[in-house]
Structure formats: C-alpha cells, structure tokens
Amino acid sequence: MENGTEGKNFYIPMNNRTGLVRSPYEYPQYYLADPWQFKLLGIYMFFLILTGFPINALTLVVTAQNKKLRQPLNFILVNLAVAGLIMVCFGFTVCIYSCMVGYFSLGPLGCTIEGFMATLGGQVSLWSLVVLAIERYIVVCKPMGSFKFTATHSAAGCAFTWIMASSCAVPPLVGWSRYIPEGIQVSCGPDYYTLAPGFNNESFVMYMFSCHFCVPVFTIFFTYGSLVMTVKAAAAQQQDSASTQKAEKEVTRMCFLMVLGFLLAWVPYASYAAWIFFNRGAAFSAMSMAIPSFFSKSSALFNPIIYILLNKQFRNCMLATIGMGGMVEDETSVSTSKTEVSTAA
C-alpha cells in the first residue's frame, strides 16, 4: 500500500521506502513512536490493572458474600465485572509487556490469542451495557406491563452477551478477517487495514460496525432516552414531591453518565477504525490509532465505577468487605438501594 507496509500477519502504517519497517513480531517498533511513548502507554495499562482488577474482582467477592446482592437484576453487573477481568488479565498484562519491549514479541499465535480475548471481553462488556439498558427500560417504562424479572430472564440476558461477543470475536479465528497488531504494534485487534486475500475483511468490518456498534448505540440511546422521558413525566405529575424530583434528577444524571461512558469508550475507536477502512491507503500515524484503541480499554475501569460503585447497595457491601464502612441496614436505605438497582443504579 502507498502509505503503509503489509507483511505476513501484520500491517505497518509506514511505507517501507524509508527502509525502517520491520516485523512487529521480531523487532522494536521505535520508528513508529519514541521509546518513552511506549513506556507511557505501558504505565497507563499498569494503572488500569491496579484499579480495574480490584474493582471488578471485589464485585464478584461481595456478590458471593452478600445474598441480598444475588438478585436477578444484578446478574448483568456481575457479568460486566467478569468481562472487565477478562480484559485486564488476558489483554492488559500482555500489552504492558509489549510496551516495555517495544514490539509484540509473542508472535502471530500470541497476537491471535490476545486479540481474541481482548475482543471477547470488550464485546461482553459492550453487550452487557445493552442488556442492562434494556432491563432498566422494561422495569421502568413497563412496555410489557407488570413484567417480573426472574433469574431465568437475567441468565438469558447474560448468555445473550456471550453469544453476541462470540459472534464478533470468533470469526477472525476461523478465517473471516484475522487478528493483527494495531497502532504502535503492541496490542492486537481485527484487521481493519488490509484487503488480504482470503480473509474477506471488507464484509467483516461492515458486519462488525453495523451489528456490534451501530445496533448497541441505537439501543442504548433509545432505552435510556425513553427511561428519562418516563421518569420526567412521573415527576411532572408529582411536582410537590421533593423525593420524586430528586429521584428524577438522579436518574437523569445516571443515564447521562452511562451514555457518556459508553460513547467515550467506543466512539473514538470505532470511528477511527471505520475511517481507516473506508479511506484505505490514506496516511495515518500509528499513534493516532493507538490512542483510541488504548482509551477503549479504559472501559474496564470506568464501567464498574459508573454501574457498580455508584450503586449504593454494591458500594456499601464493598466498603464493609474492605473494612472501610458498615452496611446501611435500616429499611429505608435498603429500599432505596433496591430501587436504584432496578432503575438508575
């Protein structure tokens, strides 16, 4: 390609007329970015591990320890924490090492494994947010009447996230697209960059962008938008109720944070990947792709902060577990927490 160099199982966004391009599996890629930039990204990933792992792991611990957290509407939050742990353990650790040495030293097979696990975890996380939005929409807006969520419904929602995630992460393993190093060549993802014969990258990227980005975006905007409208309508009917007005503001704030968190994680990465795909051959720097790629990994940290730590019931249990606070046992607080779980937590 005019502005890049395609090799076996890799694509470097630099023309080899420079004579600098080397395999990202064998040589440091310091011609793509300064060594300190590699180290800085490695430090950033280390920060995500130090913060993301404890929060996600603690979510599983407190759920196992506290029966009151093991209610159907919380299943998807546990699923979200599992997705975060997959990203941290199987993606971030490998990425840190690659940043420190300056290239993806684990080879094509390691790249495929890392790319698959990172994509799987990221997609489970993404679809968990979709299922969570739908659950809240059903509970608050009641499009199905007085529908009662059971453990079976919630388990089906969790299973759905893994099915959808697998439908995105598995195809590159079996020849529909492939996993290659991206950005500064220290982490791996689907091939948005090349028209490599036999991989049908064009159809895969279009499928991934439409089904695994546009559909979730539309669903989340529709459900949370409907939720806010419903709560505002209820608040308008009870203008004299201070508690109702406060609840309306809280729900609006939480919905805003949820949508904002989703957009910050996925829009930069998906948009830039789409631009690369639809402007194939156009010049772009490795770092310009690395930044949105690395930023999307932040979802392993701020998703549990938004969806779990801001949930009073989970937060109280976590504080009690680490010895920094007691559970709020009075009936009013528990009732408030349960309402938060089903509406705006």
UniProtKB/Swiss-Prot annotation:
Q: Which GO terms describe its molecular function?
A: G protein-coupled photoreceptor activity
Q: In which tissues is it expressed?
A: The color pigments are found in the cone photoreceptor cells.
Fetch the Pfam families from UniProt.
Answer: 7tm_1, Rhodopsin_N
- Residues with attached carbohydrate: N3, N16, N201
Entry keyword set: Chromophore, Disulfide bond, G-protein coupled receptor, Glycoprotein, Membrane, Phosphoprotein, Photoreceptor protein, Receptor, Retinal protein, Sensory transduction, Transducer, Transmembrane, Transmembrane helix, Vision
Q: Which residues lie on this side of the membrane: Cytoplasmic?
A: 63-74, 135-153, 232-253, 311-345
What GO cellular-component annotations does this UniProt entry give? photoreceptor outer segment; plasma membrane
Q: Which SUPFAM superfamilies match?
A: Family A G protein-coupled receptor-like
TM ranges are: 38-62, 75-100, 115-134, 154-177, 204-231, 254-277, 286-310
Tell me, what is an example of a GO biological process annotation in this record?
cellular response to light stimulus
Q: Ranges in the Extracellular compartment?
A: 1-37, 101-114, 178-203, 278-285
Q: Where in the cell is it found?
A: Membrane
In this chain, where does the modification N6-(retinylidene)lysine occur?
Answer: K297
Q: How does it sit in the membrane?
A: Multi-pass membrane protein
From the record, give the cysteines joined by S-S bonds.
C111-C188
Q: How is it modified after translation?
A: Phosphorylated on some or all of the serine and threonine residues present in the C-terminal region.
PANTHER family from the entry? OPSIN (PTHR24240)
Q: Which family would the database say this protein is a member of? A: Belongs to the G-protein coupled receptor 1 family. Opsin subfamily.
Primary role = Visual pigments are the light-absorbing molecules that mediate vision. They consist of an apoprotein, opsin, covalently linked to cis-retinal.
Entry protein name: Green-sensitive opsin
What is the originating organism of this protein?
A: Oryzias latipes
